[in-house]
């Protein structure tokens, strides 16, 4: 197993490390203590990432991402953690919803959501936890049935992380 980094990965690591050193001090530290108060702070950080080209690292450039490989994306995470960067607020949007919309969504859905996910304007959550399921997705019972004017949702959820902040 080879543990040395390629010159491309090492260069990306140095770039991220420099960016973190130059930009993290610009955030209004300390991070606010309660979740609702964190929203402007998180959005500011996400906006900084977007403007610097560090949002949607593995997304296709067609959809506003950088189109880089998973190795360099993991280097970004390593360097962000080492630098004490705040956690990303919109991981569900950026890591799950956005790529799904990019792959399967209509052009209208892509236009409406992808950029707003990357900039942090819209926060996404996932509703998996149910009384009899936990996170066992195969046993979920909640259903969405198409009806005139939208969908009828039947089922029950226990909790959802950051739901109170989510647009979707």
Locate predicted features.
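A short core secondary-structure module
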Residues: 141, 150, 154-168
């Amino acid at each position: 197993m080879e543990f040395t980094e390629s010159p491309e990965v090492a260069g990306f690591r140095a770039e991220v490390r420099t960016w973190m050193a130059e930009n993290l001090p610009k955030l209004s530290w300390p991070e606010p203590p309660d979740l609702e108060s964190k929203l402007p702070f998180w959005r500011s950080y996400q906006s900084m990432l977007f403007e610097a080209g560090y949002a949607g690292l593995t997304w296709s450039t067609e959809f506003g991402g950088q189109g880089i490989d998973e190795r360099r994306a993991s280097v970004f995470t390593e360097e962000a953690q080492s630098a004490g960067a705040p956690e990303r607020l919109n991981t569900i949007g950026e890591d799950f919803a956005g790529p799904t919309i990019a792959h399967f969504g209509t052009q209208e859905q892509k236009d409406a959501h992808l950029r707003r996910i990357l900039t942090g304007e819209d926060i996404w959550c996932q509703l998996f936890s149910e009384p009899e399921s936990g996170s066992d997705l195969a046993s979920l019972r909640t259903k969405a049935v198409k009806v005139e004017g939208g969908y009828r949702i039947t089922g029950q959820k226990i909790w959802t992380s950051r739901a109170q902040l989510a647009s979707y």
